[in-house]
């Protein structure tokens, strides 16, 4: 897993470097609301500054679906450049409102060694100036990849969050440069997540939540071979409950995946999969007082229109019985709608239970579970928190990380 070239394997002194980082951070009215991903990528940037490199920085931010998305500047990386300047006060950080063309080339040439130029959101290339959706970045357009590759002598990919996507700014550039490697963050992510699928200390217990089972089917299948137990809650548990013939009322069920869920449960001959046994139900999708019902074959008439929005206290106790003795824990996805106070208990209790187990190597697979743990102020109680939700699931699901597969390997 870690046979990629790393920063230490290449001479960076006075070189021009194209660095793909992951600055896909949440913004509210043009203000960064969580800078975790930017902070996580700083070590690589500082290393390259120390080597007196010219650094051409690339990142995407959100999805660009229309010309309006480009013109209203709500998805511009300018606030990221401003924050980088604050975080690196002794380094000159410039921002280019363009990411292709002669003007960009000139700016790179004019850049002094030890300085940084952040180009505009790579996904701006997904919509052209006529408003047509062309997806040059997202579909790995070779001409775009060649242009970005031409801006430097060495390519460093430190964007773990997009490691499972084959885009022009990651997989594409790696094809057209003479030298490439992974950055410190990518190295750390691969090392910690690889441990889970290569040599986890037993018992290895996995907690899966979140709304959809479709995102996690491969993960469940792959983990059946590796984990001792897979504890399932959140919205995704309903598809499995339905597959077992349980009543799910008006809860989210992915009907087209019921048969697949049934096949997975049939494969689970060692009863590794543990499903929620009670749920907190709400009459509609809003923050309200819920009612706790045991999972059963039938639901009383008056609750037929209710939906599950959290796991109940019996499920929390059941999950705790597995988690307190675990030596390795992987958690991806909240166990309820933790944004609603009345349905946050399952997620917060499971977070506390994992944090309390000081002998376990505990990993959070990015995304909403990382946000939940941050909200609970428990982030420092976990061994590792991944910056990539989808990428961590892809890796643990046994998929090839296509965004980094063309990075140079150690010979």
From Swiss-Prot:
GO process annotations (BP): gluconeogenesis; glycolytic process
Xref: PANTHER family: PHOSPHOGLYCERATE KINASE, PHOSPHOGLYCERATE KINASE 1, CHLOROPLASTIC-RELATED
Catalytic activities: (2R)-3-phosphoglycerate + ATP = (2R)-3-phospho-glyceroyl phosphate + ADP
Source organism of this protein record: Mycoplasma genitalium (strain ATCC 33530 / DSM 19775 / NCTC 10195 / G37) (Mycoplasmoides genitalium)
Traits of the deletion mutant: Probably essential, it was not disrupted in a global transposon mutagenesis study.
Domain of life: Bacteria
Gene that specifies this protein: pgk
Main location: cytoplasm
Positions contributing to ATP binding: 216, 339, 366-369
UniProt keyword list: ATP-binding, Cytoplasm, Glycolysis, Kinase, Nucleotide-binding, Transferase
Pfam families hit by this protein: PGK
EC number, UniProt record: 2.7.2.3
Compartments in which it is found: Cytoplasm
Protein name as catalogued: Phosphoglycerate kinase
Chain sites annotated for binding substrate: 22-24, 37, 60-63, 123, 165
